[in-house]
Protein backbone atom coordinates (compact mmCIF):
# COMPACT_ATOMS: atom_id res chain seq x y z
CA UNK A 1 0.00 0.00 0.00
CA UNK A 2 1.48 3.34 -0.97
CA UNK A 3 -0.42 5.56 1.45
CA UNK A 4 -1.39 5.53 5.07
CA UNK A 5 -5.03 5.30 6.03
CA UNK A 6 -6.77 5.97 9.31
CA UNK A 7 -8.80 2.96 10.46
CA UNK A 8 -11.16 2.64 13.41
CA UNK A 9 -11.80 -0.78 14.91
CA UNK A 10 -14.85 -1.48 17.07
CA UNK A 11 -15.16 -4.57 19.27
CA UNK A 12 -17.83 -5.67 21.71
CA UNK A 13 -17.06 -9.05 23.21
CA UNK A 14 -19.17 -11.90 24.47
CA UNK A 15 -18.76 -10.57 28.01
CA UNK A 16 -21.28 -7.91 26.88
CA UNK A 17 -19.77 -5.19 29.07
CA UNK A 18 -19.28 -2.51 26.42
CA UNK A 19 -17.45 -1.43 23.29
CA UNK A 20 -13.70 -1.05 22.73
CA UNK A 21 -12.54 1.32 20.01
CA UNK A 22 -9.04 1.78 18.60
CA UNK A 23 -8.07 4.28 15.95
CA UNK A 24 -4.82 3.78 14.05
CA UNK A 25 -2.89 5.08 11.08
CA UNK A 26 -1.28 2.38 8.94
CA UNK A 27 0.03 1.49 5.51
CA UNK A 28 -1.57 -1.94 5.97
CA UNK A 29 1.80 -3.65 6.14
CA UNK A 30 4.80 -2.39 8.09
CA UNK A 31 3.79 0.99 9.48
CA UNK A 32 1.29 1.34 12.29
CA UNK A 33 0.66 4.29 14.58
CA UNK A 34 -1.84 3.78 17.39
CA UNK A 35 -3.60 7.12 17.67
CA UNK A 36 -5.78 6.18 20.61
CA UNK A 37 -8.17 3.82 22.33
CA UNK A 38 -11.49 4.34 24.03
CA UNK A 39 -13.97 2.19 25.96
CA UNK A 40 -17.71 2.80 26.28
CA UNK A 41 -19.51 0.77 28.91
CA UNK A 42 -22.99 -0.46 28.05
CA UNK A 43 -25.60 1.12 30.29
CA UNK A 44 -27.18 -1.45 32.66
CA UNK A 45 -30.52 -1.50 30.80
CA UNK A 46 -28.94 -2.21 27.40
CA UNK A 47 -26.61 -4.83 28.87
CA UNK A 48 -29.58 -6.57 30.51
CA UNK A 49 -31.54 -6.59 27.24
CA UNK A 50 -28.57 -8.04 25.34
CA UNK A 51 -28.04 -10.73 27.99
CA UNK A 52 -31.74 -11.65 28.13
CA UNK A 53 -31.97 -11.87 24.34
CA UNK A 54 -28.76 -13.89 24.07
CA UNK A 55 -29.96 -16.31 26.75
CA UNK A 56 -33.08 -17.20 24.76
CA UNK A 57 -31.31 -17.62 21.40
CA UNK A 58 -29.79 -21.09 21.10
CA UNK A 59 -30.39 -21.76 17.41
CA UNK A 60 -31.15 -20.08 14.11
CA UNK A 61 -34.79 -21.11 14.60
CA UNK A 62 -34.90 -19.17 17.90
CA UNK A 63 -33.54 -16.16 16.06
CA UNK A 64 -36.20 -16.41 13.33
CA UNK A 65 -38.90 -16.56 16.02
CA UNK A 66 -37.64 -13.32 17.61
CA UNK A 67 -36.80 -11.26 14.52
CA UNK A 68 -38.60 -8.04 15.57
CA UNK A 69 -36.94 -8.00 18.99
CA UNK A 70 -33.63 -8.72 17.23
CA UNK A 71 -34.05 -5.75 14.86
CA UNK A 72 -34.95 -3.35 17.69
CA UNK A 73 -32.02 -4.42 19.84
CA UNK A 74 -29.66 -4.42 16.85
CA UNK A 75 -30.60 -0.79 16.15
CA UNK A 76 -29.85 0.20 19.77
CA UNK A 77 -26.48 -1.58 19.65
CA UNK A 78 -25.61 0.12 16.33
CA UNK A 79 -26.49 3.55 17.73
CA UNK A 80 -24.34 2.83 20.81
CA UNK A 81 -21.45 2.06 18.45
CA UNK A 82 -22.03 5.40 16.72
CA UNK A 83 -21.74 7.08 20.14
CA UNK A 84 -18.21 5.75 20.65
CA UNK A 85 -17.29 6.71 17.07
CA UNK A 86 -18.33 10.30 17.78
CA UNK A 87 -16.45 10.27 21.10
CA UNK A 88 -13.20 8.92 19.69
CA UNK A 89 -13.29 11.36 16.75
CA UNK A 90 -13.79 14.24 19.15
CA UNK A 91 -11.18 13.08 21.67
CA UNK A 92 -8.39 12.51 19.13
CA UNK A 93 -9.51 15.15 16.60
CA UNK A 94 -9.34 12.78 13.65
CA UNK A 95 -11.77 10.85 11.43
CA UNK A 96 -11.30 7.36 10.05
CA UNK A 97 -11.18 6.49 6.36
CA UNK A 98 -12.68 3.09 7.19
CA UNK A 99 -14.35 1.38 10.16
CA UNK A 100 -14.04 -2.28 11.13
CA UNK A 101 -17.30 -3.27 12.85
CA UNK A 102 -17.42 -6.48 14.83
CA UNK A 103 -20.96 -6.25 16.20
CA UNK A 104 -22.25 -7.90 19.38
CA UNK A 105 -21.95 -11.69 19.35
CA UNK A 106 -25.19 -13.31 20.46
CA UNK A 107 -24.70 -16.85 19.16
CA UNK A 108 -21.37 -18.44 18.27
CA UNK A 109 -21.39 -22.01 16.89
CA UNK A 110 -18.28 -22.42 14.74
CA UNK A 111 -18.57 -26.22 14.71
CA UNK A 112 -22.04 -25.78 13.19
CA UNK A 113 -20.60 -23.23 10.73
CA UNK A 114 -22.25 -20.05 11.95
CA UNK A 115 -21.87 -17.07 14.24
CA UNK A 116 -24.40 -14.28 14.72
CA UNK A 117 -23.43 -10.72 15.58
CA UNK A 118 -25.95 -7.94 16.20
CA UNK A 119 -25.12 -4.72 14.45
CA UNK A 120 -26.32 -3.05 11.29
CA UNK A 121 -23.25 -2.13 9.25
CA UNK A 122 -25.28 -0.25 6.64
CA UNK A 123 -26.90 1.93 9.32
CA UNK A 124 -23.53 2.49 11.00
CA UNK A 125 -22.04 3.57 7.67
CA UNK A 126 -24.91 6.03 7.15
CA UNK A 127 -24.62 7.44 10.69
CA UNK A 128 -20.83 7.74 10.61
CA UNK A 129 -20.60 8.75 6.94
CA UNK A 130 -17.73 6.26 6.65
CA UNK A 131 -17.26 2.95 4.80
CA UNK A 132 -17.70 -0.01 7.16
CA UNK A 133 -16.24 -3.51 6.84
CA UNK A 134 -17.92 -6.26 8.85
CA UNK A 135 -18.79 -9.97 9.16
CA UNK A 136 -15.28 -10.92 10.26
CA UNK A 137 -16.43 -13.96 12.24
CA UNK A 138 -18.76 -15.28 9.54
CA UNK A 139 -16.12 -15.01 6.84
CA UNK A 140 -13.51 -16.71 9.02
CA UNK A 141 -15.87 -19.63 9.66
CA UNK A 142 -16.66 -19.89 5.92
CA UNK A 143 -12.91 -20.28 5.36
CA UNK A 144 -12.42 -23.03 7.96
CA UNK A 145 -11.62 -20.89 11.01
CA UNK A 146 -13.38 -20.66 14.35
CA UNK A 147 -14.58 -17.10 13.92
CA UNK A 148 -11.76 -15.04 15.42
CA UNK A 149 -9.62 -14.03 12.45
CA UNK A 150 -8.08 -10.78 13.66
CA UNK A 151 -6.68 -11.71 17.07
CA UNK A 152 -4.14 -14.26 15.74
CA UNK A 153 -2.82 -11.79 13.16
CA UNK A 154 -2.47 -9.12 15.84
CA UNK A 155 -0.67 -11.54 18.19
CA UNK A 156 1.68 -12.72 15.44
CA UNK A 157 2.58 -9.14 14.49
CA UNK A 158 2.96 -8.16 18.15
CA UNK A 159 5.52 -10.95 18.56
CA UNK A 160 7.42 -9.62 15.54
CA UNK A 161 7.23 -6.02 16.78
CA UNK A 162 8.55 -7.04 20.22
CA UNK A 163 11.28 -9.02 18.45
CA UNK A 164 10.52 -12.19 20.43
CA UNK A 165 12.57 -15.07 19.01
CA UNK A 166 11.23 -18.00 21.02
CA UNK A 167 7.87 -19.67 20.42
CA UNK A 168 5.10 -17.64 22.07
CA UNK A 169 1.61 -18.52 23.27
CA UNK A 170 -0.86 -15.65 23.72
CA UNK A 171 -3.96 -16.36 25.79
CA UNK A 172 -6.95 -14.08 25.35
CA UNK A 173 -9.42 -14.50 28.22
CA UNK A 174 -12.81 -13.04 27.40
CA UNK A 175 -16.34 -14.36 27.11
CA UNK A 176 -14.86 -17.01 24.81
CA UNK A 177 -11.20 -17.66 25.62
CA UNK A 178 -8.82 -18.27 22.73
CA UNK A 179 -5.12 -18.67 22.16
CA UNK A 180 -2.55 -17.97 19.48
CA UNK A 181 0.64 -20.01 19.12
CA UNK A 182 3.43 -18.37 17.14
CA UNK A 183 6.79 -19.87 16.17
CA UNK A 184 8.96 -18.25 13.51
CA UNK A 185 6.57 -17.40 10.64
CA UNK A 186 4.04 -20.07 11.63
CA UNK A 187 1.02 -19.25 13.75
CA UNK A 188 -2.24 -20.94 14.62
CA UNK A 189 -5.16 -20.04 16.85
CA UNK A 190 -8.18 -21.74 18.39
CA UNK A 191 -10.98 -21.14 20.83
CA UNK A 192 -10.09 -22.60 24.21
CA UNK A 193 -13.40 -22.55 26.06
CA UNK A 194 -16.31 -20.47 27.20
Please place each PLM-identified region on the residue numbering.
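Short acidic/glycine-rich loops and adjacent helix/strand connectors
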Residues: 1-194
